[in-house]
């Protein structure tokens, strides 16, 4: 009888243990799920929104400096992708974009007059000229937003970074959604720029541009212990232009605002566009979105297909050493009359411009 009672107690004890173990396993599944904190939305796909840019995205081949182009065909489900990503897009106006043009006083007459006559005339309020010398005549004649940075006119790393530092601070002050930097030898195709940026949200981390190299740059990052570490990162070449969303620009502030940009540049001893890439890719770990819609004089511009020229975001032309490096676009102007081809492109985009030849007008 005693043995039977002991066996019974042992059985009850084992059943109790099994029941408790089962409860321990079931309790987490019975509790209501905890609410997760809001996570940042993913960046949109690196593609233009819709026609005409949809079919005109070009990327450089392995020889980026040579200017080779490879057309990227749109996927079959591109329209569905457009619908899925529509909530990422901004309904942009040109007034939402801060376009910074970097120049120097010696190019005021030769380059700025051409820009003010062409694309800048269509975006005067959105375009800000950053230079190193006062020019009252140009300011009054062209009605441009000219900002004298008081930086050196020398083409040195320090001078370039000084101007970029002022560009960044002025953009932050402007409260605009997008910062786009170009050089004074770029033509900005405004409709294409507007459509490209509309494919993204300005609150997201977006860094758009074209590398001048086919590989990441490697830099020696100086540290306080008198040593250095090697860092690799992509950067968008300033000669082709690049754009940064406001959301990302604000995150750059510790290394870029109020003169900190110059200090950061000295840390890696690289020019302004490289320093931008260093801050964004190496420090903030935000990847560059590579796009072939931006173009610089480093490329072979003659290889850009004529039928796609007006779909690009920026164009350029060769300097004194390579005057023939221009886009191949026909029009009423001869090469002698329009050596940069900027006037020809402008008259194709805006045929009703007063100075465009009549036969190109509607």
UniProtKB/Swiss-Prot annotation:
Location of the protein in the cell: Golgi apparatus membrane
GO molecular function: metal ion binding; O-fucosylpeptide 3-beta-N-acetylglucosaminyltransferase activity
Coiled-coil segments: none
Keywords: Developmental protein, Differentiation, Disulfide bond, Glycoprotein, Glycosyltransferase, Golgi apparatus, Manganese, Membrane, Metal-binding, Neurogenesis, Notch signaling pathway, Signal-anchor, Transferase, Transmembrane, Transmembrane helix
The keyword Plastid belongs to this UniProt entry's keyword annotation: no
Binding site residues for substrate: 111, 184
Ranges annotated as spanning the membrane: 12-32
Cofactor note: Has some activity with cobalt but not with magnesium, calcium and zinc.
Main location: Golgi
Lumenal side: 33-362
GO process annotations (BP): brain segmentation; cell differentiation; fourth ventricle development; hindbrain development; Notch signaling pathway; regulation of Notch signaling pathway; rhombomere boundary formation
Segments for region (Disordered): 33-80
Catalytically driven reaction(s): 3-O-(alpha-L-fucosyl)-L-threonyl-[EGF-like domain protein] + UDP-N-acetyl-alpha-D-glucosamine = 3-O-(N-acetyl-beta-D-glucosaminyl-(1->3)-alpha-L-fucosyl)-L-threonyl-[EGF-like domain protein] + UDP + H(+); 3-O-(alpha-L-fucosyl)-L-seryl-[EGF-like domain protein] + UDP-N-acetyl-alpha-D-glucosamine = 3-O-(N-acetyl-beta-D-glucosaminyl-(1->3)-alpha-L-fucosyl)-L-seryl-[EGF-like domain protein] + UDP + H(+)
Protein's job: Glycosyltransferase that initiates the elongation of O-linked fucose residues attached to EGF-like repeats in the extracellular domain of Notch molecules. Regulates neurogenesis in the hindbrain; involved in boundary cell specification via Notch-mediated activation of wnt1 expression.
PANTHER family (alphabetical): FRINGE-RELATED
Family: Belongs to the glycosyltransferase 31 family.
Protein name per its UniProtKB record: Beta-1,3-N-acetylglucosaminyltransferase radical fringe
Encoding gene per record: rfng
